Amino acid sequence: KMIECARRKGLSLKREAFRESGRKITYYRGVREWFGRINAYGAGRGIDVQHYINSSGIKEILEGTDIAREFKNIYASSFLYDDEGAAYWPAVGVNYTNKTQFIYKINKGVESVSDTKLVNQYLEEEKRPVQFKHMIFIGDGTTDIPCMRLVKSQGGHSIAVYNPAHQGSFE
């Protein structure tokens, strides 16, 4: 439906058009500085801090942001593209259920969004590349709640961010 609607409105569905949209994203105060500060803080304590995006948003838009390079991986919704580079069908659709699976993929070091074998193999917690107790999940929406609960229940930390200027954003 989204693709049909965009075509009717004459909007470009090319990967580069999505990335261009990402270049226009505005951030909460301090987001750009966060990465350098937290990476330096971790390095000073012998910790290799890794950042991931786990979003129900569009991956190609997120890849266009000026902070995309800070992330080891971006788990998000994405499209299939035709020979001219235009989106024609969803490749990955992300909801709160997928997002919890992506947390396990991060936990077990599985980079592929489509892998269902490695993520489901047993691996002792202490052998996992990113243990839950070392995770900090920062979320801003209702699809983040299950991930926040998962990370917190496994010994990690969860932080909810919201814009106080938006009516009802805290509820």
Give, region by region, the residue ranges found by the protein language model.
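Metal-dependent phosphoesterase signature
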Residues: 2-30
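C-terminal cap/substrate-recognition subdomain and adjoining C-terminal extension
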Residues: 22-52, 56-171
